[in-house]
Amino acid sequence: MPSWLRVSLICLAVILAVSFTAQMLMNAYLVRQQKAHEAEQKAIDDHYPLMYADSIRRISAEYNLSPSLIASVIMNESSFRPTVQSSVGARGLMQLMPDTAEWIAHKLRMDDYRFEMLDDPDTNIRFGCWYLNYLSTLFRGDPLCVVCAYHAGQGEIASWLANPLYSTDGITLNRDSLPDGPTKIYAGRVIRDYGIYQAKYFDQADFTSSPDPVDSD
């Protein structure tokens, strides 16, 4: 065999070996990337579960609310535990207080209402959606105002809107300027999780549009 042919064959073998090694390394990299993606997705699934999805979709649609918002509120209020009761008496998936729930029951004309009925997921979601719809109407559909009011009460948020430290226009709030405390933390988590639930589970327009008003007379 001529020396030039031997050298050519050796070079070809080296090129093929390098190409094969590169392909193997690329395949191994892609496998690692896929496993990392699957692990990340599992972590999201574990941290952001979705239960009662049919009820959330159906009832939120009745009140023209984003199901992602409802799922996020439920996640932060009760972690989807339907019978949980807080130390201050809030109950169920959306952690409704007794006085608020009784007022909502009156608005919904539920003459047979009892507080323990809020352990029922559909009932609790309906009450929570009614209340969020009411707050959305009151605060012109501003997401931050609505979420803060759900946590701290509408009177507190009205006072924040009247304070130039927290609102420059009396209509919207600046989250970075809100007073430090549980409501600021809560609102940040709900709005963050809203985006995650929206991206992962739901395909719907953003919640910033104003809902149809409920009868609050």
Question: Which residues are covered by each model-predicted region?
Answer:
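N-terminal Lys/Arg-rich, disordered targeting/topogenic segments
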Residues: 1-4
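Hydrophobic membrane-insertion alpha-helices, especially the h-region
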Residues: 8-25
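Catalytic glycan-binding domains that act on GlcNAc-containing polysaccharides
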Residues: 27-217
